[in-house]
A protein has these predicted regions:
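Intrinsic-disorder/low-complexity loop/linker signature
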Residues: 1, 21, 53-55, 133-134
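Generic recognition of long tandem-repeat/solenoid scaffolds
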Residues: 1-4, 10-15, 55-66, 98, ...
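Beta-strand-rich N-terminal accessory domains
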Residues: 1-43
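Broad, structure-driven detector of short, well-ordered beta-strand segments within folded domains
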Residues: 1-9, 79-89, 149
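Acidic (Asp/Glu-rich), glycine- and aromatic
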Residues: 97-141
Length: 149
């Protein structure tokens, strides 16, 4: 699923991965912290397009969500960086390709802060192997444990 199950109060949205009926990853989206908290700023969804022929879902989003900035009981504080971006999820054979395209470069002050966050559901992955960017390992049996090489 891509940007279909959105729960703004719980700050849940983005790319969710479901394999054999079990959610294995969620909240795949751009965030301003590597491990976002409950009251962290989230983007505003502008559009979502499904292209069945190319097996692609494209979602257009923006920061900040001006309707949420500094409002409510626990006000959200958006960083001073306005931009629009697209998250594209494409099925290619037995793989999923996720790409993120921003409408402008990331300012130097946000390098290392603005990141694509994908939260894995650890108990399903404990002890299972992973491969990413020519690296491989085994998921730890504790959520905060070391990843085995």
């Amino acid at each position: 699923m891509a940007f279909m199950d959105i729960y703004p109060v719980g700050h849940q949205a983005g790319v969710s991965m479901i394999m054999h009926g079990k959610r294995i990853a969620t909240n795949g989206d751009l965030r301003f912290e590597p491990t976002p908290g409950q009251w962290q700023a989230v983007p505003k969804q502008l559009d979502r397009t499904l292209d069945e022929k190319s097996n692609t879902i494209t979602t257009k989003l923006c920061y900040p969500d001006k309707d949420q900035h500094l409002t409510g009981f626990n006000p959200l504080l958006y960083p001073d960086f306005e931009f629009t971006y697209e998250v594209r999820v494409h099925g290619e054979g037995g793989h999923i390709v996720v790409s993120v395209d921003l409408d402008r470069p990331v300012p130097e002050e946000f390098l290392g802060k603005l990141c694509f966050n994908l939260e894995l559901v650890p108990h399903i992955l404990f002890g299972k192997p992973w491969i990413m960017d020519q690296k491989q390992g085994i998921f730890p049996t504790q959520p905060n444990g070391p990843t085995l090489q």
